Amino acid sequence: MRLALRIAYDGTAFYGFQRQPGLRTVEGEIIRALTKLGIIEDVESSNFKGASRTDRGVSAFFNVVAFDVASRPDLVRPEVLNFHLKDVWVLGTAEVPEDFHPRFWAKSKTYRYYLIDAGFDEKAMRECAKLFIGTHDFSAFARLEPHKNPVRELIRADIIKRQGYYIIELEGKSFLWEMARRIVNALRFCGLGILTEEEVEKMLNGEYSRKIPPARPEGLVLWGIEYEGIEFRGNEKGIRKAKHDLFERYSEALTRAALFGDLLLGL
């Protein structure tokens, strides 16, 4: 039997998703819990796979892992797993085909970036965002790896205005390393008048050697992954711990924001 988990996590608590010797990672935390419960024996025999290897500091509301169950499939429930996990929350489970790979079966991925309003020219940001939609060579907007094709398709680039901040939502079939964060910084630079639409077009066409640095990872969330025929099921009991933990983090963040806001006003 092969099962998949829909997971959320606080990326600031980990050194990224992928296992690294001596470091706390999302993948390592999940594998620790699964082996402790006897659900899997080890990574190799369980064919453990993840959908997205998010960087250090990047959070997720919808990432996916899959594995072959060695025993105790009855324990693969959000309420059981969440009791044994820290800073990771299982929001749903699904039985999947034996050849299911969460990365290769994904139809699209959606990232959200939360950006404090620094007096941006919203119109300039929106015009700049339109340039990224479609199929392009994103070499100027990614940390390139030798074996990766830099051509990718961005399905949409939405800018959502909220009170005091923006949400930049990017959906694509796949993303290069740091691609989402570098696109965000390009939009930020356009909004600040540091970068023009013409320069962005030249970079996408390979006519301009300038590279855009990545935005900070803490503002990025893997928001969604689309699959065909895979339905993740959860329940209120299963997500109770997630709600409690996220509210604690939300309360702490609001307290610190209020504190530093008053310090800033007092200067």
From Swiss-Prot:
One Gene Ontology MF term: tRNA pseudouridine(38-40) synthase activity
Protein keywords: Isomerase, tRNA processing
Keyword hit for Ion transport: no
UniProt catalytic activity: uridine(38/39/40) in tRNA = pseudouridine(38/39/40) in tRNA
Xref: Gene3D superfamilies: Pseudouridine synthase I, catalytic domain, C-terminal subdomain (3.30.70.660), Pseudouridine synthase I, catalytic domain, N-terminal subdomain (3.30.70.580)
Entry EC no(s): 5.4.99.12
Chain residues that bind substrate: 111
A Gene Ontology BP annotation from the UniProt entry: tRNA pseudouridine synthesis
UniProt xrefs under CDD domains: PseudoU_synth_TruA_Archea
Active site: 55 (nucleophile)
Claim: tRNA processing is one of the keywords in the record: yes
Coiled coil: none
One Pfam match: PseudoU_synth_1
Family: Belongs to the tRNA pseudouridine synthase TruA family.
Task performed by this protein: Formation of pseudouridine at positions 38, 39 and 40 in the anticodon stem and loop of transfer RNAs.
Protein name: tRNA pseudouridine synthase A
Lineage: Archaea, Methanobacteriati, Methanobacteriota, Thermococci, Thermococcales
